[in-house]
Amino acid sequence: MRYLTSGESHGPQLTVIVEGIPANLEIKVEDINKEMFKRQGGYGRGRRMQIEKDTVEIVSGVRNGYTLGSPITMVVTNDDFTHWRKIMGAAPISEEERENMKRTITKPRPGHADLVGGMKYNHRDLRNVLERSSARETAARVAVGALCKVLLQQLDIDIYSRVVEIGGIKDKDFYDSKTFKANLDRNDVRVIDDSIAQAMRDKIDEAKNDGDSIGGVVQVVVENMPVGVGSYVHYDRKLDGRIAQGVVSINAFKGVSFGEGFKAAEKPGSEIQDEILYNTELGYYRGSNHLGGLEGGMSNGMPIIVNGVMKPIPTLYKPLNSVDINTKEDFKATIERSDSCAVPAASIVCEHVVAFEIAKALLEEFQSNHIEQLKQQIIERRQLNIEF
């Protein structure tokens, strides 16, 4: 399974083509749009999300509510394009018109793709870089992940996410599955412990008032994953390696870990390895889950726990020092409309990116042309965990 996105932040639309979804999977566009709506929420978002009403139009690959097995094309319209039609349109415009609209960017933002992207593609107007490097593209990735979540639900695989930390204020590292699920989306910072939600909001407000931004840590959990998905044989088939690549490909994500993650470096092996147990109902299972459901690059049947680190957004309303690429003079960096904190929304993006990586790995492990075939293979693998 693979996908390709296209579109710019202030262009007319985002388009995504997904190839490899099995036939006969029931798809309701409202289920996808429900996930799209979640991405737009969260405390700390900027004015852009007040303009956009992200909904998906499916234009190929689904007929009368069921997938055909052919490529699925989805479109997300950018409502803000109305204000950018001339500057972002395909038709040529004069340099005078461009200057009059004050949309040319020559002062790159530290921490963004602006300067290096301009060098790489020889763009003297850095808007050509930031329009594509913008996190607006993640709307298309959430649409892909939403499709994958529908597939995973048919296989009795649950995936959900939360915020663990914002600006140094932390929720508990781990919760039991029941507590986690019962408290999803109960507040606008997406933490389980309501008592720290206001402290996080205050931290976000403080950053906004200072013209600054803050980052944090998100967590994604995948439950009821069959054993043995991934491989120990080759580096590029390891499931944790694939998930890690997907997570750090999200805008502003700078780190990823599994289970206890970097804390594993502080403990002896006897406190980190998960002991193997067996009973006739569950088959093999682990007495703990310090490793986050992954051993030797493969799923071991325990919940897969993924932690992603998001740096503060690089666009600041109190901009840092930069250099004008035309005059080489010192200037403050360009200011673009942005969020002061996008960690709650990023947890949704991360959830859907992980959903894609999980679905892709499953479809490689259990090659199937239609959903019924895939379901049967999953049943057989789960039975193997009991009978082996």
From Swiss-Prot:
The keyword Lipoprotein is assigned to this record: no
* UniProt pathway annotation: Metabolic intermediate biosynthesis; chorismate biosynthesis; chorismate from D-erythrose 4-phosphate and phosphoenolpyruvate: step 7/7
Q: What is this protein called?
A: Chorismate synthase
Single GO BP term: chorismate biosynthetic process
Q: Which family does it belong to?
A: Belongs to the chorismate synthase family.
Q: How is the cofactor bound?
A: Reduced FMN (FMNH(2)).
Its EC top class is lyase
